[in-house]
């Protein structure tokens, strides 16, 4: 029975079983490795794909082989990707960054929660069965101190987080020796700076300049440091979250773990249903990647879903609640200004951003300026105390290609640039959110406008979708736009699943969206010329040409699907060593023919060389030894 046909009770039971039986799992023929740094505790996880040797000659009885190097790849799965680590979702993950945070001596534990809502939830005994058992004692900055990675970077301090990131971004490529694997085409970077080797100092400099962010709330010590910036690998975000009509805490934790397994660099919890607070605590305590939220969603729940009843006080309380739980970045729709709302009147699809529409409705009902804009400096003060990064939301993004690149969209973008400078005054890290629905010929302007007006802060886009005709396939329509804008300089891509515009994604939808977007991000890295990006492609091509089927499966982004498709027509074990596949068969395989041509050419060259030497020998009179003057 498919997931969509299961009853709600069955879905929850299945998710609970997943959580209860969860253990570290490696991909086929892969092993977890760790690269260490100079800072204490800097131990960077990577996945190393083991490859089989290449047959280069010999006889059937005594074949000769040449070893193929293992391929290290970036790994977002955290402890879930290490079979040696015991996983217990009830206890949460190890607090990797806690010693680094404590060693800086600029934070203090809170004896009382700052959020009234949090206090009320903790006092409610009826929530005990839902509550995560090991609730973290939150920290905040000491009086007069700032604890953001941007602050440290501006002070010239290289933090352990920065060293961790430098090692991670290099992807272990210094381990690769083969010239065949290291070969890479020159890229076109559109002004991005892509050093051959990423150092901790380079990371520090990019963060200090505001060109990159490290989302790392001091209350989320379980997270493994990562970076978002156009001079680094293109990252992918996955959205999860329950709603008022579907999903549960168990299912959201399952989606979190599933997302990190398939390559999510960050995860946004967009929950809008009951138990938002409790769901988020479970997610944070079990997440090895940064977690983002849209706080206005929960603030709206607190006023019973009535946008007109929203207040700054309710929103501020929500920020404090989430910051002290450990949320790493907030999407804030502070650029939806009252004067911009009429600009959307002529649009085909109006305002499609949920947060944008909430704030537009509030502005119109009160005929006042957006309170997020009015109180933006106070928002920055809160973020600076916990190192919460700001993701400035595009509440006026286009919801159809007809509305792309219009006056409202770019008016808001320019305001986001103004807000970026204000956030930087408080040493708060910032990225900018972008569209949306944009046809291919109009995509690059989005990147150039953002770089110019938002001062090179990292860009983070939803797609964009390049056509509106394919519900059910919008992971594909948006993947095209995502690859393009990633090439042009977008730092992080928010995935779109096949369920976009149709319903809440399930576990399989999450996987499909992530695989699509990992392809888009990798294609962008290749096009930019990111050092080492082509190594895995070269390894795959070599395995393909040498008919090493197992290696082809294991080098794939999704080894299980690759193997399943192959085995649909050649399921026998002999098919794993055959020098053909079912597409062309044994007589028409182009690569087999190419190998035969290459072997024939090599044989012909040898035979021609021998013939030339024989003729030369006869021309010299058949003497075995030559006189010195003839030699």
UniProtKB/Swiss-Prot annotation:
PANTHER family noted in UniProt: PHOSPHOMETHYLPYRIMIDINE SYNTHASE, CHLOROPLASTIC, THIAMINE BIOSYNTHESIS PROTEIN THIC
* Pfam families xrefs: ThiC-associated, ThiC_Rad_SAM
What start-end ranges are recorded for coiled-coil regions in this protein?
Answer: none
Residues bound to [4Fe-4S] cluster are: 581, 584, 589
Gene3D superfamilies, sorted: 6.10.250.620, Radical SAM ThiC family, central domain (3.20.20.540)
A Gene Ontology biological process noted in the UniProt record is: thiamine biosynthetic process
Specify the enzyme's EC class, one word.
Answer: lyase
Tell me how this protein assembles: Homodimer.
Manner of cofactor binding, per the entry note: Binds 1 [4Fe-4S] cluster per subunit. The cluster is coordinated with 3 cysteines and an exchangeable S-adenosyl-L-methionine.
Keywords annotated in UniProt: 4Fe-4S, Iron, Iron-sulfur, Lyase, Metal-binding, S-adenosyl-L-methionine, Thiamine biosynthesis, Zinc
EC assignment: the record states 4.1.99.17
Cross-referenced InterPro entries: ThiC (IPR037509), ThiC-associated_dom (IPR025747), ThiC/Bza_core_dom (IPR038521), ThiC/BzaA/B (IPR002817)
| Role according to the record | Catalyzes the synthesis of the hydroxymethylpyrimidine phosphate (HMP-P) moiety of thiamine from aminoimidazole ribotide (AIR) in a radical S-adenosyl-L-methionine (SAM)-dependent reaction.
For this protein's source organism, the top of the classification is:
Bacteria, Pseudomonadati, Pseudomonadota, Gammaproteobacteria, Enterobacterales
The entry sums up its family as follows: Belongs to the ThiC family.
**Entry keyword annotation includes Transferase:** no
Q: Which cofactor does it need?
A: [4Fe-4S] cluster
GO terms (molecular function) for this protein are: 4 iron, 4 sulfur cluster binding; carbon-carbon lyase activity; zinc ion binding
Q: Which residues bind Zn(2+)?
A: 437, 501
- Annotated substrate binding sites: 239, 268, 297, 333, 353-355, 394-397, 433, 460
Q: Which reaction does it catalyse?
A: 5-amino-1-(5-phospho-beta-D-ribosyl)imidazole + S-adenosyl-L-methionine = 4-amino-2-methyl-5-(phosphooxymethyl)pyrimidine + CO + 5'-deoxyadenosine + formate + L-methionine + 3 H(+)
Its domain of life?
A: Bacteria
Q: Which GO terms describe its cellular component?
A: cytosol
Biological pathway: Cofactor biosynthesis; thiamine diphosphate biosynthesis
Please identify the protein, giving its name as recorded: Phosphomethylpyrimidine synthase
Keyword Plastid appears in the UniProt entry? no
């Amino acid at each position: 029975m498919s997931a969509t046909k299961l009853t709600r009770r069955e879905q929850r039971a299945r998710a609970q079983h997943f959580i209860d039986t969860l253990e570290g799992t490696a991909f086929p023929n892969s092993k977890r490795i760790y690269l260490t740094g100079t800072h204490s505790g800097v131990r960077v996880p990577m996945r190393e794909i083991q490859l089989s040797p290449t047959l280069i000659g010999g006889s059937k009885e005594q074949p000769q082989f040449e070893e193929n190097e293992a391929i290290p790849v970036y790994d977002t799965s955290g402890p879930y990707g290490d079979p040696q680590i015991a996983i217990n979702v009830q206890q949460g993950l190890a607090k990797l960054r806690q010693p680094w945070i404590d060693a800086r001596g600029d934070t203090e534990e809170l004896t009382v929660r700052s959020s009234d809502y949090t206090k009320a939830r903790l006092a409610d005994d009826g929530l005990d069965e839902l509550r995560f058992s090991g609730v973290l004692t939150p920290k905040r900055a000491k009086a007069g101190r700032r604890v953001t990675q941007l602050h440290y970077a501006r002070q010239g301090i290289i933090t352990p987080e920065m060293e961790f990131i430098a090692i991670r971004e290099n992807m272990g490529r210094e381990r690769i020796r083969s010239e065949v694997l290291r070969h890479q085409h020159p890229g076109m970077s559109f002004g991005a700076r892509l050093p051959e080797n990423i150092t901790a100092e380079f990371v520090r400099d990019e963060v200090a300049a505001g060109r990159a962010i490290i989302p790392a709330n001091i209350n989320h010590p379980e997270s493994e440091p990562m970076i978002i910036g156009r001079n680094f690998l293109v990252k992918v975000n996955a959205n999860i979250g329950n709603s008022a009509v579907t999903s549960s805490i168990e299912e959201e934790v399952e989606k979190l773990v599933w997302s990190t397994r398939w390559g999510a660099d960050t995860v946004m919890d967009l929950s809008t249903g009951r138990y938002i607070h409790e769901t988020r605590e479970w997610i944070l305590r079990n997440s090895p990647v940064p977690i983002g939220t849209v706080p206005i969603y929960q603030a709206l729940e607190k006023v019973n879903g009535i946008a007109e009843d929203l207040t700054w006080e309710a929103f501020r309380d929500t920020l404090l609640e989430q910051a002290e739980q450990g949320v790493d970045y907030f999407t804030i729709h502070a650029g939806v200004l009252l004067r911009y709302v009429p600009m959307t009147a002529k649009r085909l699809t109006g305002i499609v951003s949920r947060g944008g529409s909430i704030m537009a409705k509030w502005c119109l009902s009160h005929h006042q300026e957006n309170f997020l804009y009015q109180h933006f400096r106070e928002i920055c003060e809160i973020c600076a105390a916990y190192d919460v990064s700001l993701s400035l939301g595009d509440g006026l993004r286009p919801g159809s290609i007809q509305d792309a690149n219009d006056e409202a969209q770019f008016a808001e973008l320019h305001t986001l640039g103004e807000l970026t400078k204000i956030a930087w005054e408080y040493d708060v890290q910032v990225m900018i959110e972008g569209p949306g629905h944009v046809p291919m010929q109009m995509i690059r302007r989005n990147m150039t406008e953002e770089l110019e007006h938002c001062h090179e802060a990292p860009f983070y886009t939803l797609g964009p979708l390049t056509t509106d005709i394919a519900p059910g396939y919008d992971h594909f329509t948006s993947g095209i736009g995502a690859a393009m804008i990633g090439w042009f300089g977008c730092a992080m891509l928010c995935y779109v699943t096949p369920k976009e515009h149709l319903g809440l994604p399930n576990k399989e939808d999450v996987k499909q969206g992530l695989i699509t977007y990992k392809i888009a991000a990798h294609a962008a890295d290749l096009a930019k010329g990111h050092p080492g990006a082509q190594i895995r492609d070269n390894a795959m091509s070599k395995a393909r040409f040498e008919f090493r089927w197992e290696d082809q499966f294991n080098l794939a982004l999704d080894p299980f699907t690759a193997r399943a498709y192959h085995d649909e027509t050649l399921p026998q074990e002999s098919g794993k060593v055959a020098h053909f596949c079912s597409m062309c068969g044994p007589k028409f395989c182009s690569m087999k023919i190419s190998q035969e041509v290459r072997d024939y050419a090599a044989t012909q060259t040898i035979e021609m060389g021998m013939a030339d030497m024989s003729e030369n020998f006869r021309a010299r009179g058949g003497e075995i030894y030559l006189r010195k003057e003839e030699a």
